[in-house]
Amino acid sequence: MRKFSVSKVALLAATMAPALLPAAARAEGTAAPAATAPATPMSNRDWWPNRLDLSPLRQHGVESNPMGGKFNYAEEFKTLDLAAVKKDIEALMTTSQDWWPADYGHYGPFFIRMAWHSAGTYRTADGRGGAGGGQQRFEPLNSWPDNVNLDKARRLLWPIKQKYGRKISWADLMVLTGNVALESMGFKTFGFAGGRADDWEADQVFWGPENKWLADQRYHGDRKLQNPLAAVQMGLIYVNPEGPNGNPDPLLAAKDIRETFGRMAMNDEETVALIAGGHTFGKAHGARKPEGCVGVDPAAGAVEDQGLGWNNKCGKGNAEDTVSSGLEGAWTANPIAWTTQYLDNLYAFEWVQTRSPAGAIQWVPKEDATFVPDAHVKDKLHKPIMFTTDLALKTDPAYRKITTKFRQNPDAFADAFARAWFKLTHRDMGPRWRYLGAMVPAEELIWQDPVPKATYAMIDAADVSALKGRILATGLTGPELVRAAWASAASFRGTDMRGGTDGGRIRLAPQKDWAANNPAELARVLKALEGVATEFNRAAKDGKKVSVANLVVLGGNAAIEQAAAKAGVTVEVPFTPGRTDASQAQTDVASFEFLKPAADGFRNYYDASANRLSPSEMLVERANLLTLSVPEMTVLVGGLRALDANAGGARHGVFTDRPGTLSNDFFVNLLGMETKWQKAATDGVYEGLDRKTGKTRWTATPVDLVFGSNSELRAVSEVYGSADANAKFVNDFVAAWTKVMNLGRPS
């Protein structure tokens, strides 16, 4: 699955061993590796740091994919013997390797942590992170302080990946292995879906403003966390297990937990289930002080290290001498079995503060309670441990209520953990049609943004033609139809595959009320289209029906065809029916609010109060979320301006005397030297003055003018502004428009 960007160690539910922050990492003064060597030539970005960065629109190209552009991972996965893969993974669980021995003779907890940390980077604000793409293989995630020693987990898995090759991606294999780990230790999971294609390069993701591991410049005011971030410090998945910035205050830790897990789409019950369920298994590793023992992370390693990092030169370097998170110990007496011991121990003892051998703050029973077996040394026993973040589950009133309920009702605990684990590992996959394999659960879940299956016959080509005529006969204008269709489609995010035209949620709260969507105008358009649908469905034969979701797109198509004809180009905009109308009950309003556009340069919309990036940067961000290339972004902006499709009917960037005609006038008039541009009295607006008369010809925003000021965008704009470009412009616009209208649908 492709991930896009512009621009969560511990708690780690990781079950098992929150990969800590070796002391080396815990020290806030530890800087991240330098991005470039001193001898590296200056890049254009170095010379001109304020230059608009278009690279997000060029990542994950087919050129970087060794499988080639025709490779279809979904089809390969369908040929996979999933039962055989699971059998091989289960055998691996108890086949301990001398180079990295399994704790308690079972790799299950280790692999749960791997899967958790693969998926746990997901964040709701922009849909980035998550298990899709297998990004844990690449920098920076493969070298985050929170991911210490997970490089070994993936190396343990390599023989299985090697065996099944292209039939299973690393992204799917890591999640599946986490599931099998749970099942092999007696837990019944909710299910598993394949379908996560691998990425072949690191995502360009804004993980925070800091340039040092574990720094936290992401906060401002009264500990307000910067959007879209969902972790407390650079290099952590969620929170610091020792407490906020190492402050061992469970109540303050609870605040961080609630915010970070909430930004990963988890409510209080799901959060408690994940932490308590995860810490039922395995142990944390902090047998020695990292300084003087633990080497550099994988990305900073020498070529002979072959991508393995954090090499430990003290003692055995592994087993009972392992250093990962820096915390040390297990939560239960049976860390490789599903039990309620974590919750029982949490409430059974009075916990007192201590430090691990690595120096990390943790908690042990005040009582004489030495009953936890050592993971490697026979007959050696330890006290159970808790993190500050564990004690938060008993100290915080809301969390205490939930842990008490789970302790009294183990079945409810198991069910909550199973569901939360499934959500954690599948949240970024998008609609259910992308789920593959025999283990996909039948139950439909609200966070999957469900859409109903069609129970009627689809419209055919003749119906499409007739419906376009009916739509145009409603009296709705071309710009109104285009704006409604774009508002529906542009909600899509390629990061987590949410939004888009399917489901017709443009009719529902919250989308119908978003300022960018012109609510009053949109309501009028939808009322007219609903009338067309009602009339057609009442009269249609052969069981045919048409959804409003389809009509919204079809209306935009009809308007574009009409506008192209005005420009002298005959074109038929491709249309594929199949969209159905979701209900309000199928729509989680709070969840969908994260899709609300704070900016959409394609319709010249920008809310300055809600953005950390400039209008032009937010245009690139929107294009990135829509999986567009630089040329596609360019032609769409030019076309939408010509179609007079700005939000609220604003005139900025409508560089034409014939708005509503699909002409290349935007580019012709922007590139011509007849106009001189200057800042207007209104902030963020520019005036285009006739060089001869001094009269104002046009007004514009930075989003409009960047296509003339940025050298790369100007080069593309010149293609579309040429005298022979009108037909190419229309055809390219139609192709890009059609792509956007179909985002989030089966290809």
UniProtKB/Swiss-Prot annotation:
Q: Which UniProt keywords apply?
A: Heme, Hydrogen peroxide, Iron, Metal-binding, Oxidoreductase, Peroxidase, Signal
Q: Where is this cross-link: Tryptophyl-tyrosyl-methioninium (Trp-Tyr) (with M-264)?
A: W116-Y238
Which residues form the Tryptophyl-tyrosyl-methioninium (Tyr-Met) (with W-116) crosslink? Y238-M264
Check the UniProt entry and state the signal peptide residues, or none: 1-27
Q: Cellular component terms, GO, for this chain's entry? A: cytosol
Pfam families registered for this protein in UniProt? peroxidase (PF00141)
Residues reported in the UniProt entry to bind heme b:
H279
GO biological process entries: cellular response to hydrogen peroxide; hydrogen peroxide catabolic process
Task: Return the cofactor note field.
Answer: Binds 1 heme b (iron(II)-protoporphyrin IX) group per dimer.
Q: Which cofactor does it need?
A: heme b
What this protein is called in its record is Catalase-peroxidase
**Organism in which the protein naturally occurs:** Novosphingobium aromaticivorans (strain ATCC 700278 / DSM 12444 / CCUG 56034 / CIP 105152 / NBRC 16084 / F199)
Question: Lineage from the top down?
Answer: Bacteria, Pseudomonadati, Pseudomonadota, Alphaproteobacteria, Sphingomonadales
Which gene is the coding source of this polypeptide chain?
katG
